[in-house]
C-alpha cells in the first residue's frame, strides 16, 4: 500500500490517475486506503485485506466508498477492524457494525474510553458486544 501511494503521489511519475489498482496487503490503514482511492478514478480492489486499522472516521469512509466499479473500493465487508480512537460517537460505531454499510468481522474497540450518544444508540452498541468470534465489538 505504501508503495502504491508513493507512486501515485510522486511528481516524478506522470499520467497516473485512472488506473484500476489491486491492494495485496492483508493489513491496511484505512486512511492510506482512502488516500489511494482518492489518487485514482479507477477501482481499488482490496479483497486480500483481512484487517483494517485506523480511526473510526477513516474506517467508515473506506466502507462508504465500497462499490464494484468506478471510483470505489471493492472487496470489503468481512474484515477485522482495529480502531485507534479514544473518543467516538455511538452512531458511527453502529454504522461500522451494520452489514450493509460496514464489516461483518470483529471490531476491536479496546482503545476507546468515551462513547457519546443517546441511550438507545448506546444500547445498540453494547448489544453488538461479543466475547469471541466475529460480527461485533470486542474491548468495550
Predicted regions and their residues:
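General marker for long, soluble alpha-helical cores
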Residues: 1-140
